Regions:
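Canonical P-loop GTPase G-domain recognition
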Residues: 164-222
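Glycine-rich phosphate-binding P-loop
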Residues: 26-49
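Well-ordered, non-membrane alpha-helical segments in soluble/globular domains
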Residues: 118-143, 172-186
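Inter-motif core of Ras-like GTPase G domains
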Residues: 89-135
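Conserved beta-strand/loop subsegment of P-loop NTPase cores
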Residues: 103-106, 136-161, 191-201
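Switch I (effector-binding) loop of TRAFAC-class P-loop GTPase G-domains
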Residues: 45-78, 84-89
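Short acidic, S/G/P-rich loop/turn micro-motifs used as interaction or catalytic elements
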Residues: 35-36, 85-87, 110-115, 162-166, ...
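Short, flexible boundary segments at extreme N-termini or domain junctions of P-loop NTPases and their
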Residues: 1-32, 140-141
Length: 222
């Protein structure tokens, strides 16, 4: 290898690193109320143990940049904290559209397994999947047709609070954990649309490495 070739390779690597620092990848983080979305945002912003969140998120906050570093690699992302109550679901759609979200993290916990009558998360998931798969931004009136780049690159379904429920249920492989069972129809619908789904477990409050690795995996593998 000549000196010039080596120099070009080094410069290309440095430009790539600079691009990762300056270019913020738009992530959308959605899910039911009190599932841990705000906690995840705190963990992305300040690495370490996240204090208890006392106030619920109201509406949609301004998107902010977060930089993650893991295994010597670095990525900059941009996320917005949005409430999970039914009246804020429309804000999820606005967030996807206005920020041109490329990756989506849908957060769940084990409430649907702990209390089988609690279907809040399944309803959230159905709304989100239908919104993503619809060829229109305004699905009701069939207006504002989406373009190919309006669909997310991948959707992650993250089972949060793993530290609290990891020993409560029997499973052999985390990818086949029963916590994901209630969401498989939506995952299949997304796959049929050509949008891959990434199943992941995380403890957003206490394990920053799990959070950072999950984000990095979505960016690098999809």
């Amino acid at each position: 290898m000549s000196i010039m070739t080596g120099f070009v390779i080094i410069m290309a690597e440095q430009i790539g690193l600079l691009w990762k620092r300056l270019h913020a990848v738009p992530f959308g983080v959605y899910g039911a109320t009190q599932v841990g979305k705000t906690t995840l945002h705190h963990q992305l912003r300040t690495r370490g143990e996240v204090p208890k969140i006392k106030e619920r998120t109201v509406g949609r906050s301004r998107a902010t940049r977060k930089t993650i570093k893991i295994d010597g690699d670095q990525h900059t992302i941009r996320t917005s904290d949005i409430g999970g109550e039914t009246l804020y679901w429309g804000e999820w759609l606005k967030d996807m559209k206005t920020r041109k979200v490329k990756y989506i993290v849908f957060m769940i916990d084990d409430r649907h397994m702990d209390k089988h009558y609690d279907i809040e998360q399944q309803l959230c998931w159905t709304f989100l999947v239908d919104t993503i798969c619809s060829p229109y931004w305004d699905a009701i009136n069939r207006r504002q047709k989406k373009k190919s780049h309006d669909y997310p690159v991948a959707v992650g379904i993250w089972a949060n609070k793993f530290d609290l429920w990891k020993d409560k249920y029997e499973y052999e492989d985390i990818q086949n954990h029963p916590i994901f069972e209630s969401f498989k129809d939506g995952m299949q619908k997304l796959n049929d649309k050509g949008i891959p789904c990434y199943k992941y477990v995380v403890s957003a409050k206490s394990d920053s490495e799990m959070v950072y690795r999950g984000i990095a995996t979505m960016i690098e593998d999809y």
